[in-house]
């Protein structure tokens, strides 16, 4: 069986005396793709925030790439996690160029600040954009892209 990339074991997330996620067990293997569906307020976003290391469980164990959340450096895990959503698109600075959106993924940030990037970072981003046939958008700002283009840039990221 392919290796586990994500494992939830009896995971609970509690807010304001209410379980948002209630004793969830879930395993994702390397060769699997999942869709998370449910009504508003069911905990879908919370589950994805756990998987993206943006949130820790109240109880239970979340393991990502064999690393237990809470016992591992999330800043080392995050570059290995790909995540695309409308919520993430809203967090990308609209004035950020497409090449920067893709380039900053290697550092688990959404948008450039004052960090210095190396030539290899830009070459890698340009290569990925070309592979996804998005190289014509390199100098466009993220906020000027259509929703479909934004999603493709996030996936390339």
What function would you assign to each model-found segment?
Residues 86-144:
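ABC-family P-loop ATPase nucleotide-binding domains
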Residues 28-30:
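Conserved hydrophobic segment flanking the Walker A/P-loop of ABC-type ATPase nucleotide-binding domains
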Residues 146-152:
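ABC ATPase nucleotide-binding domain "signature motif"
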Residues 6, 20-23, 138:
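Conserved structural motif at the start of ABC-family nucleotide-binding domains
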Residues 155:
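Hydrophobic anchor residue at the start of the ABC signature
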Residues 52:
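Helix-to-loop junction immediately C-terminal to a conserved catalytic motif
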Residues 37-39:
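The feature captures the beta-strand-to-loop junction immediately N-terminal to the Walker
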Residues 60-70, 77:
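Conserved ABC transporter NBD signature motif
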